Amino acid sequence: MKPPVNQSCQHYPECAGCDRLHIGYEKQLQHKQEEIEKRFKGFKGLEIRQIIKSPKDQMYRHKVQLPFGHRKIGKKSVLTLGLHNKENTFIIDQKECRIQDEDLTTVAAAIRHWARNENLEPYHEKKGSGLLRHIVLRKANATQEILVGIVTNESEIPGRKKLTDRLYSYIQQFLYKENSKADVVGILQNVNRKNTKVVLGEKEVTWYGRHFVKEKIGKLDFQIGLSTFFQVNPFQIENLYNLILEDLPENKCVVDAYCGIGTISLYIASKSKKVIGLEENSSSIRSAIGASKANGIENVHFIKGKVLDTLRAALNENSDVVVLDPPREGLDAETKSILLNSKVNQILYVSCNPETLLRDAIELTKSFKYEKITPVDLFPHTSHLESVSVFTK
C-alpha cells in the first residue's frame, strides 16, 4: 500500500477517526459522487445531482466523544484520552485533530491535564473498574457555548465540589491561552455502570451551570444536551434542510418520522399546513415541544412512540408527505409496508448510509418513482456520506 500523502495530522493514519485525510478534499468529493452514481445507476429516470461540499472541511465537528485509556511507560501506567487506533487495541493520546472544533480539542486537553493531576483512574473495560469512561463535548456554533460531559463508572465521587472547581479552572486557563471566545456553560457527570459499548448512561448530574447549549438553525432556537441528536457539522445543516424545503410542496400535511428534537419539523413548518413529528425518545420529545413553544410555532404536533407504532395513525391525518431521517440501519420491513400501502404522494428520505438507502429504495419503488438523490458531504475526510432522496407517486 502506498504511504499517505498530504498527511496533516500526527495521528494519521493510525487513528480510526479519519480514513481519507491523505486525499485532497476535491478528490474526496469526486470519489463520493462516483460512489453514489455507481450504487444508484440502476434506477431508471433517477436524477443524481452533484454533491454539496461542506463549507468547512476541517475542524467542523461540534460534538466530540473520546474514551479514556491508559498506557505503560516503564512500570508506570499513564492515563490517556483520545480515539481508538484502527485495530481497536489501545487509545491514542490525542494531541490534535483535523476534523473536530479547535476549542473542543483544547477542552479535551484541559480535561486530560485535570484527570492526571487528580490521579483519577481510567475505566478498565475487561475488569469493569476505574472511574473515567468517556468525555462528551458539545459546542454551539451560533453562541460559542460549550457543554462538558464526564462519563463515569461510579455515581458518588468524593470531593466532587473541589474536583469541579479545579476542572472548570483548568478549562478556562487552557481556553484563555488559545485566545478562545468560547464559553463553558455547563459541566455534567453522566453515570454509566453497565458493561456496554454505549457511551452514555441514563443518570445525569449537573456539576456546574446548565445541562444544554443554545444553538440556532436559521432563525430557530434550540437547546442541545449531551444525548441530543443534532448534526455534528453545523456548517452543513441549513444546506441539508434546504434540500428538503426545496422539494416540499406548499401547504401540505407532513409527517416527520424520526424527528429527534424537531429540527426538521420546525424548519419546514412555515411552508406546511401541519407537521406531525414522530419520536420514541422521551427527552427528545420534551425538547421538541419546548422548541416549538419557544419559537412560537403552532402548526407542529409531536407524538412520542416508535415510528412503527405511530406512523399508521399519523398517516390517517390526511398526510400528503413523509419526511424520513432514520438511523444508519434504515427502515424496517413493516414501516416500508405501511408507506407502500399509504396514500402519501411524496417521501423525502434523509439517509446517512447509502447501503441501507439502496435496500430501502428498491422496496419503495414498488409504489413510488425514485426522482432524485442529492449527496451531501457532512463528514469530510471520512467515508461517511449523507443524502436527500425524493420519491413521488
UniProtKB/Swiss-Prot annotation:
EC top class named in words: transferase
UniProt binding sites for [4Fe-4S] cluster: 9, 15, 18, 97
SUPFAM superfamilies with a match to the protein in the record: S-adenosyl-L-methionine-dependent methyltransferases
| Keyword Amino-acid biosynthesis belongs to the record | no
Q: Where along the chain is the active site annotated?
A: 352 (nucleophile)
Write out the residues that bind S-adenosyl-L-methionine: 231, 258, 279, 325
The EC designation for this entry is: 2.1.1.-
Classify the source by domain of life: Bacteria
The region annotated as signal peptide is: none
Q: Which UniProt keywords apply?
A: 4Fe-4S, Iron, Iron-sulfur, Metal-binding, Methyltransferase, S-adenosyl-L-methionine, Transferase
A GO molecular function held by the record: 4 iron, 4 sulfur cluster binding
Q: What processes does the entry annotate via GO biological process terms?
A: rRNA base methylation
> Which family, according to UniProt?
Belongs to the class I-like SAM-binding methyltransferase superfamily. RNA M5U methyltransferase family.
Query: What is this protein identified as?
Result: Uncharacterized RNA methyltransferase LA_0292
